Amino acid sequence: MFIVAVLMLAFLIFVHELGHFIIARICGVKVEVFSIGFGKKLWFFKLFGTQFALSLIPLGGYVKLKGMDKEENEENKINQANDSYAQKSPFQKLWILFGGAFFNFLFAVLVYFFLALSGEKVLLPVIGGLEKNALEAGLLKGDRILSINHQKIASFREIREIVARSQGELILEIERNNQILEKRLTPKIVAVISESNDPNEIIKYKIIGIKPDMQKMGVVSYSVFQAFEKALSRFKEGVVLIVDSLRRLIMGSASVKELSGVIGIVGALSHANSVSMLLLFGAFLSINLGILNLLPIPALDGAQMLGVVFKNIFHIALPTPIQNALWLVGVGFLVFVMFLGLFNDITRLL
């Protein structure tokens, strides 16, 4: 599974660079180089004017667009060609830069969609344990929840989702001994301190006091529309989780010791015990890769998009030497974060 995990990570990088490549070609920009990895090219071939390469350091990838690295030199003849990045509109430039993250997001949604369409292994909505408020509402161990507020329930996960966004009293339709019963209860709000142990960071959530029966598993199939809805819901959950983790890291409420590097990521991927688990983790990692690339850090897509906005909308452009210096700072920062993650991975193994 370790080799499969490494290949999955390489594939996600390929998906990201493929996004830049395809959007650039749609916008009429010539792609000079498409590389998986950085540094010395180990193997390459040329096709339709593009050099496709596999490079020495497999910790990323890049596409080299015609005219992109010489965009500041307005007199350069290469910039006057119609297939040059420099000649494209601000919208096209932003679309090309966003293309990598867009393909990462698209890959994740498609994985979630096809897994839901093919049948998802889930915990059935059968009660395995109860707390006081659930008992007082008349619920019993072994009850199967059919619907909440007239919304059909197929898995225990859906119960949590509906309860989380509910308002006021809930109407539960349950099956008990082949009879359909209706029960009513109001969720209670529980407040806990986050994992950071910061007393100022309180997490509140709603519960109805039931636990699943871990032995009751089943496969739920969805229609095309339902599968698409599930895919978007899972994608949204992934985005919220990643953005919140970044926020906590930036605000200092999460420790940098929580960062993982390549070893940790590959290790987590290699623990997937089925193809569906590997794909689910790969989809989440793909969302992560897309969001991280949109951060406004020099050398990442987000900073380049910010540069396009400032130059073409606010008419503010930094001199090339300053841009190059910022790029080096950005690369240095990313290398530092990478080695910090690697250090954390090794520390966990010791």
Curated annotation (Swiss-Prot):
Entry's EC annotation: 3.4.24.-
GO cellular component, one term: plasma membrane
Keyword list, A-Z: Cell inner membrane, Cell membrane, Hydrolase, Membrane, Metal-binding, Metalloprotease, Protease, Transmembrane, Transmembrane helix, Zinc
Species whose genome carries this gene: Helicobacter pylori (strain J99 / ATCC 700824) (Campylobacter pylori J99)
GO MF terms, alphabetically ordered: metal ion binding; metalloendopeptidase activity
Chain positions recorded as Zn(2+) binding sites: H16, H20
Domain PDZ: 108-177
Catalytic residue list: E17
Protein name stated in the entry: Putative zinc metalloprotease jhp_0242
Membrane topology: Multi-pass membrane protein
Membrane spanning stretches: 43-63, 94-114, 249-269, 277-297, 326-346
Superkingdom classification of source: Bacteria
Enzyme class: hydrolase
Family, as annotated: Belongs to the peptidase M50B family.
GO BP term (any one): proteolysis
SUPFAM superfamilies, sorted: PDZ domain-like
